[in-house]
């Protein structure tokens, strides 16, 4: 197993307080914060944590939305879910936890900026969720997720509007055409892919979105076009 760097006692106590869980196996937290790029042995262990954390997050958010929005249909719930488990939201949680102070990355990753660095922060949050789940169980992981996602779920008013549906209605009314979506690129490992999707509406400039599923990337691209054309107000940061 790749060896993770060890947090200081002070840093560990501070971070455990933010997480709301004291780790019984301290190395789990260290491993979760040590990105694959900082390990001497590259490979599956860190990616397995991301994989598990992504599934635990998805389950807890799906349950939260199901209970919170009792009259919402599957389409609305899916839009909200995609927004709340997106790389942008996970990275925002990482920032709220000040994980940049604790994440260990390789030299190459330290040079990354923008979207790529956001994805690293999102990956670490997923790994952290897996570590919490493995150390404390599902209820402890759920408590952590509710602590940092429940407010976002309630604030995400824009998610109740399906961007693709609204863009289609607008483009039909204005241009008499249906938006066309195409997948430009698929990257990343099988367990954590990234899709770049472009939406085109005849007569105006196209827009693109990058997300972890084609459906979510389509929503991002449609949202960008709606905001650019003044149909929607630009989403506030953090939502």
From Swiss-Prot:
It is an enzyme of class 3 (hydrolase). Its main location: cytoplasm. Residues 162-231 form the DRBM domain. Pfam families: dsrm, Ribonucleas_3_3. Its cofactor is Mg(2+). GO terms for molecular function: double-stranded RNA binding; metal ion binding; ribonuclease III activity; rRNA binding. One of its GO terms (cellular component) is cytoplasm. SUPFAM superfamilies: dsRNA-binding domain-like, RNase III domain-like. Residues 12-137 form the RNase III domain. Its EC number is 3.1.26.3. It comes from the Bacteria. GO terms for biological process: mRNA processing; regulation of gene expression; rRNA processing; tRNA processing. SMART domains: DSRM (SM00358), RIBOc (SM00535). Digests double-stranded RNA. Involved in the processing of primary rRNA transcript to yield the immediate precursors to the large and small rRNAs (23S and 16S). Processes some mRNAs, and tRNAs when they are encoded in the rRNA operon. Processes pre-crRNA and tracrRNA of type II CRISPR loci if present in the organism. Homodimer. Belongs to the ribonuclease III family. This is Ribonuclease 3.
């Amino acid at each position: 197993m790749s060896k993770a760097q060890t947090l200081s006692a002070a840093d560990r106590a501070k971070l455990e307080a933010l997480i709301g869980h004291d780790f019984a196996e301290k190395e789990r937290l260290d491993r979760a914060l040590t990105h694959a790029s900082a390990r001497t042995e590259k490979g599956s262990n860190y990616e397995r944590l991301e994989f598990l954390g992504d599934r635990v997050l998805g389950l807890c958010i799906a349950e939260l939305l199901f209970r919170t929005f009792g009259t919402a249909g599957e389409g609305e719930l899916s839009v909200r879910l995609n927004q709340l488990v997106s790389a942008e939201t996970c990275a925002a949680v990482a920032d709220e936890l000040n994980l940049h102070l604790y994440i260990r990355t390789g030299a190459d990753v330290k040079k990354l900026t923008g979207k790529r660095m956001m994805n690293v922060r999102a990956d670490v949050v997923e790994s952290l969720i897996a570590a919490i789940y493995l150390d404390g169980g599902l209820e402890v992981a759920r408590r952590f997720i509710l602590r940092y996602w429940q407010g976002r779920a309630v604030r995400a008013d824009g998610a109740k509007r399906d961007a693709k549906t609204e863009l289609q209605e607008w483009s039909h009314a204005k241009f008499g055409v249906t938006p066309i979506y195409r997948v430009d690129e698929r990257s990343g490992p099988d367990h954590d892919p990234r899709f770049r999707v472009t939406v085109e509406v005849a007569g105006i400039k196209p827009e693109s979105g990058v997300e972890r599923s084609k459906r979510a990337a389509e929503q991002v691209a449609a949202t960008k076009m709606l905001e650019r054309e003044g149909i929607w107000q630009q989403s506030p940061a953090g939502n």
